[in-house]
Amino acid sequence: MMLEPSIDKLLDQVDSKYSLVVLEAKRAHELRDKERPTKEFKAVKRTLQALEEIADGTVKIHPAPELKRETLVEKRELERLQAKMKEQLIKEQIAKEEAEEEAKQKNSRAAKAAAAE
């Protein structure tokens, strides 16, 4: 039984078996943590999915791990700020709707008071 992707095809994408194992493990963890896949998979297991991506060349070892780490930190910070801004917009919309509702109620009470006189 031939395993797909083959070890030869995989080793064409990385420098060594060690690098392959490390890349596979890291990518499998990313996929488990809901990182966006780069393709449709034949395999069900995350480790085999990672190997499929490596064989296709869509996942590579980052040349500067520190830079990748910084990029991830920046990405997470940006996502956090975007979520905070979205939350703030929702709060502002709620406050605006509450103010409009309060104004309608005031106008309604004023109209009733004027009609009663």
Curated annotation (Swiss-Prot):
Keywords: DNA-directed RNA polymerase, Nucleotidyltransferase, Transcription, Transferase. GO terms for cellular component: DNA-directed RNA polymerase complex. Its EC number is 2.7.7.6. One of its GO terms (molecular function) is DNA-directed RNA polymerase activity. Transmembrane segments: none annotated. The keyword Transferase applies. It catalyses: RNA(n) + a ribonucleoside 5'-triphosphate = RNA(n+1) + diphosphate. It is an enzyme of class 2 (transferase). Residues 96-117 are annotated as: Disordered. One of its GO terms (biological process) is DNA-templated transcription. InterPro entries: DNA-dir_RNA_pol_omega, Pol_omega/Rpo6/RPB6, RPB6/omega-like_sf. Residues 108-117 have a biased composition (Low complexity). Belongs to the RNA polymerase subunit omega family. The RNAP catalytic core consists of 2 alpha, 1 beta, 1 beta' and 1 omega subunit. When a sigma factor is associated with the core the holoenzyme is formed, which can initiate transcription. Promotes RNA polymerase assembly. Latches the N- and C-terminal regions of the beta' subunit thereby facilitating its interaction with the beta and alpha subunits. This is DNA-directed RNA polymerase subunit omega.
